[in-house]
Amino acid sequence: MIGQNEYYGGQVRSLEFKNEQGNFTVGVMESGEWTFEAPVKEWMRLVHGSWDVQQPAGSGGWTTYREGEQFEVPGGTDFTVRVTDTVAYLCPYTGEFLGHLDM
């Protein structure tokens, strides 16, 4: 089963799925600055574009990631992503599904 998530008035959208390799979301973000909570450990892999990441959110420092790069988000933390042009990402994560799937 595939779940759908929408954030920030549709500016960020993702699909989530689970298979024998684990739990995943794959999504797209329009330009803007978006803050997310990560209740469980996850990895944000940039598939297309570039973004600046502030980890944890509000910490002051920004790191730029480009297509093909990833960063790790510890569970129980938050992060902010600053996007200047539409990006696509893959997010493997630990634990149970966080969105709309009932599996």
Protein language model features and the residues they cover:
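Transition segment at domain starts
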Residues: 1-20
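Ligand-binding loop in jelly-roll beta-barrel domains
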Residues: 75-103
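Short, conserved beta-strand element in jelly-roll/cupin
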Residues: 38-53
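Conserved short histidine dyad/triad with adjacent acidic residue
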Residues: 10, 19-39, 65-75
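Ordered hydrophobic segments in well-structured contexts
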Residues: 26-27, 45, 88-92
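Mid-chain, well-packed structural core segment of small domains
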Residues: 51-83
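Helix-adjacent hinge/juxtasegments
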Residues: 4-9, 70-73, 87-92
